[in-house]
Amino acid sequence: MKEPIVNGSDSELELLISELVNYGIEVFNKEEDKFQRWMKKPTNSLGNNTPESLLDSVAGIQEVRNCLNRIEFGNLA
């Protein structure tokens, strides 16, 4: 039996996640290992959730991106 074709919503999330990962690696000075560790660590600014736990919605992905923006520009509050 064939796998179902990915619906539009899923492909949008996949694209946003891909862009987020690329951005995150840049924020962590192209050190992918550091970025991957950060993704698995609970973060205060994300309500003590891990960034990777929020990647199931557009809103969650945007929250993680906002957090990365704060890291990039030194505004960790």
Placement of each model-derived feature along the sequence:
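Non-transmembrane "mature" sequence context
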Residues: 1-77
